[in-house]
From Swiss-Prot:
Residues 93-223 form the GST C-terminal domain. Keywords: Transferase. Changing D195E: In strain: cv. Fidel. It is an enzyme of class 2 (transferase). It catalyses: RX + glutathione = an S-substituted glutathione + a halide anion + H(+). Glutathione binds at H41, K42, K54, M55, E67, S68. One of its GO terms (molecular function) is glutathione binding. GO terms for biological process: glutathione metabolic process; response to toxic substance. Conjugation of reduced glutathione to a wide number of exogenous and endogenous hydrophobic electrophiles. This is Glutathione S-transferase 1.
């Protein structure tokens, strides 16, 4: 049995992030599925793994971690060298490492807050509200799209200068965008990316990666209560 266990549902963005980096480095792992609709993540045994009662929980031997971005960094530091990957830029020099850090922060502090409300309003809230069919709050969507366009404009300028966000090699900063952007691209607003050709080409390169495809096949493009995900 693999010493690495991921507790959660693969359709959830933060679980998908952890699975993505495990797939990138080729690490052996066990996914322990959890039914979030039934509230399994709130049960005492899971709270021991994640005190905030969120998913994922992560266990590697005696080590227990939570927070998906932190887990992903741990995975890369433990297994990335064996896989011949330097996605954190730690072996590339201090300037390269700094650029990875900058764009990792941009994803978490600028991109995620802009794109996630659209995903929540269009996909997640209608899915979790009893009875389904809840209409998105269009004011929230419109304000978020305006903010997202501003962020994408900055990305477009950056990607005119380099193949990826932190330079000409793919890094942790790029791959962190996968989970929420994947779901955003299933909303009626996916065409926003068409106005930013460099960004769209970058996104298509990310989606072409085998590890990304393996993880995204477990992320549904339609959500229905009672469906088996």
């Amino acid at each position: 049995m693999s010493p690495v266990k991921v507790f959660g549902h693969p359709m959830l963005t933060n679980v998908a992030r952890v699975l993505l980096f495990l797939e990138e480095v080729g690490a052996e792992y066990e996914l322990v599925p959890m039914d979030f609709v039934a509230g399994e993540h709130k049960r005492p045994q899971h709270v021991q793994l994640n005190p905030f009662a969120k998913m994922p929980g992560f266990q590697d031997g005696d080590l227990v971690l939570f927070e998906s971005r932190a887990i992903a960094k741990y995975i890369l530091r433990k297994y990335g060298g064996t896989a011949g990957l330097d996605l954190l830029g730690e072996n590339s020099g201090i300037e390269e490492l700094a650029m990875v850090d900058v764009w990792t922060e941009v994803e978490a502090q600028q991109y995620y807050p802009a794109i996630s409300p659209v995903v929540f309003e269009c996909i997640i809230i209608p899915f979790i509200i009893p009875g389904g069919g809840a209409a998105p709050n269009q004011t929230v969507v419109d304000e978020s799209l305006e903010r997202l366009r501003g962020v994408l404009g900055i990305y477009e300028a950056r990607l005119e200068k380099s193949r990826y966000l932190a330079g000409d090699s793919i890094t942790f900063a790029d791959l962190n965008h996968i989970p929420f952007t994947f779901y955003f691209m299933t909303t009626p607003y996916a065409k926003v990316f068409d106005d930013y050709p460099k960004v769209k080409a970058w996104w298509e390169m990310l989606m072409a990666r085998p590890a990304v495809q393996r993880v995204c096949k477990h992320m549904p493009t339609e959500f229905k209560l009672g469906a088996q995900y």
